[in-house]
């Protein structure tokens, strides 16, 4: 059964947000969605079903080579500052690493030269092609980048404020019940980025 997960969000353990897990759970329950909490350089410490909503813990790794979302690897992955060492470590742990907002914020295509960005994109798992804080043009460039490298595209709102919640998400062909399912389905490419209609 298909389901939508908003893969990129920040809560009380990120410094630049006033959102809490309860805010996401309340809105996700109304919309019938699941949510990932991806704190800056910290693995969110709550996961599983919370008040009827699936919560998936992840990390947004803020790296000299750009910003990356990680699922299925421990928090100590942030200690790997060299990007290919980080990617290898995440994969050894059985996780996935996502190029977050590659053309906006401190995305990989803004952090390094095009040749290095291409090498990095070739090694990550999917590319975030829809980001709630990125411009339409930057999202389109990310979509083309993912296609050029044969990578799945995923989406997340990157919410830091209430008005930013549940703008973008990722539709999975099969039901996700935990981080293990999420990692497997991303690896198999059984996912696509979607815009979320919050007026439902």
Q: How would you name each of these model-derived features?
A:
Residues 39, 101, 157:
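Short beta-strand/turn micro-motifs composed of small residues
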